[in-house]
Amino acid sequence: MKLDTYQEAAARKILVYGPPKSGKTDLVGRLAEKYKLHWLDLEDGIKTLLHSPRMKKEWMGNIELYKIPDTQMTPAAIETMLRILKGGTQNICHTHGIANCVKCKATDAPYTPINISSFGPNDVLVLDSVSQLSLSAMNYIQREILLKDNFDKKPDWDDYAKQGRILERIFSILQAAPFHVVCISH
């Protein structure tokens, strides 16, 4: 390829970082004025937008919400994120926030589909929050220990290495993605 034929990718990757209650979610939510946001909500931060005086009601129609109630005992965020990033349509259940949830499929429970392969130049994947995704990875790695209620067992170096590899896979895919990505962290 000749340099004069190269076209720079328009997709942007942004990290919004700050302490709690500093306006991160509100700032990202305002992108809905011009873009369609696909909001992966791991910490219930979307409530901030529902009560924000700066968030216009007409913008809310541009936000597709995927509630992923991630907890220590049920680290759904990491598995769901990995499945979403594989591409193809993933149906995120409203009850558990799990991609293609077997329990919810059996009962015809509601879900919201997501297919990052179909994202265009006006789509933005919002990950709220990277902090929770990192915790989810460690909880996933230590799930057998946690299921035994052994809360005194601290992660060892191998656990941190596994966590790093999982997060590296996720962020390398996001870095190369042909769509916009906004990560919120604290």
Report residues per predicted region.
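P-loop NTPase motor core
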Residues: 117-186
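Conserved P-loop
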Residues: 2-114, 118-124, 132-136
